[in-house]
Amino acid sequence: MNPDSDYPHLPNIKIHHPSSPRHSHHHSSSTPSAATPTPTAGARRKIGVAVDLSEESAFAVRWAVDHYIRPGDAVVILHVSPTSVLFGADWGPLPLQTPPPPSAATDPGAQPKPSQEDFDAFTSSKVADLAKPLKEAGFPHKIHIVKDHDMRERLCLETERLNLSAVIMGSRGFGAEKRGSDGKLGSVSDYCVHHCVCPVVVVRYPDDRDGPAPPGNVGATREAIVTVKSRRDDDDDDDEDHEAKIAAAASDHHEHIKDE
């Protein structure tokens, strides 16, 4: 690393290549030169923030710093990098790249296809950017990047493997007026709510339907709609679902909780 670089150093950025933890029994023959302290070791709570490189994820990180993470906590920024597709802000699949037209193969001016190494470097850089609010707030944290074709299952597997106390994830449009016909959350957040072993906090990114930001409050934003769900043996019951409207401005930490 260039010591004169302005880019912030973030500890323990990992990219795990096995498609599943079940196939990770083969260890590298290389031996680490020295054991380094884990930033999350000894924390009172280990909070995971699942990110997908979107503005919704950036909002969820900022919300977690302002309203959820407390002194004594440590944070794991968790990203599942898809093996064949990119996942957009709504946690839905988008093609990683479309096949070039036949003429592109012989066009000397055609852009070269990015390599897997390019994509890995881009992913690490974007996730590091998302973690900046944690560094600025002084919360101990690490970045954990894994690869899998099934984002939903892998998020739940990593949540259990990392022994997280709670997982926070961002989402756009999961409010009552935007839910599916069955009233469920989005596919990934809904899966995590019902399969993660710890509570899942889904932070809805506010949009124009939520109205303007509060007047006269410099730096204020519209309120975030937050759904908190805990997994229980009877987790199909509606009475587990609690919605909260929480002001996203850092200066206001009053929470208004209501049961559905």
Curated annotation (Swiss-Prot):
Can bind nickel. This is Universal stress protein PHOS34. Its main location: plastid. Keywords: ATP-binding, Chloroplast, Nucleotide-binding, Phosphoprotein, Plastid, Transit peptide. It is found in: Plastid, Chloroplast. GO terms for biological process: response to molecule of fungal origin. Residues 1-33 form a transit peptide. Belongs to the universal stress protein A family. InterPro entries: PHOS32/34, Rossmann-like_a/b/a_fold, Universal_stress_UspA, UspA. Disulfide bonds: none annotated. Residues 1-42, 92-118, 209-260 are annotated as: Disordered. Residues 14-28 have a biased composition (Basic residues). GO terms for molecular function: ATP binding. GO terms for cellular component: chloroplast; cytosol. The modification Phosphoserine is found at S20, S230. Residues 251-260 have a biased composition (Basic and acidic residues). Phosphorylated by MAPK3 and MAPK6 after pathogenic elicitation (e.g. bacterial flg22, Phytophthora infestans zoospores and xylanase). Residues 29-41 have a biased composition (Low complexity). It comes from Arabidopsis thaliana. ATP binds at residues 18, 80, 170-179, 187-189.
